[in-house]
Amino acid sequence: MKPYLLLTPGPLTTSETVKETMMTDWCTWDEDYNLHIVEALRKELVGIATRNTEEYTSVLLQGSGTYCVEAVIGAAIGKNDKLLICSNGAYGDRMGNIAEYYHIDYELLAFDETEQVSVDYVDDYLSNNSDVTHVAFVHCETTTGILNPLKELAHVVKMHGKKLIVDAMSSFGGIPMDVSELGIDFLISSANKCIQGVPGFGFIIARRSELVRCKGVARSLSLDIYDQWETMEKGHGKWRFTSPTHVVRAFKQALTELIEEGGVEARHRRYCENHRVLVEGMRSLGFVTLLDDAIQSPIITSFLYPKTGFDFKAFYTALKSKGFVIYPGKISKADTFRIGNIGDVHPEDFARLVEVVRETEY
């Protein structure tokens, strides 16, 4: 099969060295794995998330990022709590679906998919609804690529004394942030996003005191984040159930490569440059971005169809034949396609993509 670059928001293109680490088998009971890989990366994750490493901890969970979102909602929201979900896309809406399944008391504030979650609206809602105990939203909503105002929203949530859950699936490791400074209680992300690992597990960066409060609350055995965390703490990296060993080892390598690149700030600069080269090039060909530049993330970029009758499938196939895989659109109000800027991809790759698009019939 002809190799290609995944210009998608995860799974994404990984380095050869990340792939190579999966060629070795690991024993889930061995210290070489649990202590030197799992425990080491748990500490590294907290170090990436905050300078306040004593107050925060991390827990890893098998499955996709959504498993972790469901696990947090199912364990952090008690029977007498109320969750406010602020949504401007499919992944915020999914939080509502999870709350519905668990019969959790919640309210969903729905915003337009091409507009940020309104800080003023959230502030007003919390001022008039004192029964809310937790607030959740998506930082980078990959439905469109929109970046919600994390700092401002976090400030409002903490000003009202609420617990904060942030889905940072597609931003953690690629956009600088400090969970302690922001007052985040639970941050959720996944191995196959900005850290540039492969799919197979997600992780939660949690305030220790809030994670302890999850004891006995979880509505699912396999998604019990307190029990998973306690097992890892006492077992020095041991997982309750079968660990995705190859994926974990690849993630450890990906973390090493993040540090070698210069950390989150350096990776963010590369993603921003990828985005700049892509957008400038596509605009020169007549393509129009869905979002205003001011609210656009450097993670994934949505473009409007260039004309009526545009055949996305043919366009997709043509690009794939030249070594690039892109994403279809995910919103109902406009015909779009999406191009991811994250992964082991660089500005020269996007310059080459633009030339391929220039030569493509569409």
UniProtKB/Swiss-Prot annotation:
Pfam families xref list: Aminotran_5
Keywords linked to the UniProt accession: Aminotransferase, Pyridoxal phosphate, Pyruvate, Transferase
UniProt xrefs under Gene3D superfamilies: Aspartate Aminotransferase, domain 1, Type I PLP-dependent aspartate aminotransferase-like (Major domain)
Signal peptide as annotated in the record: none
Catalysed transformations (reactions): (2-aminoethyl)phosphonate + pyruvate = phosphonoacetaldehyde + L-alanine
Protein role: Involved in phosphonate degradation.
Family: Belongs to the class-V pyridoxal-phosphate-dependent aminotransferase family. PhnW subfamily.
Protein name: 2-aminoethylphosphonate--pyruvate transaminase
Species assigned in the record: Bacteroides fragilis (strain YCH46)
Lineage: Bacteria, Pseudomonadati, Bacteroidota, Bacteroidia, Bacteroidales
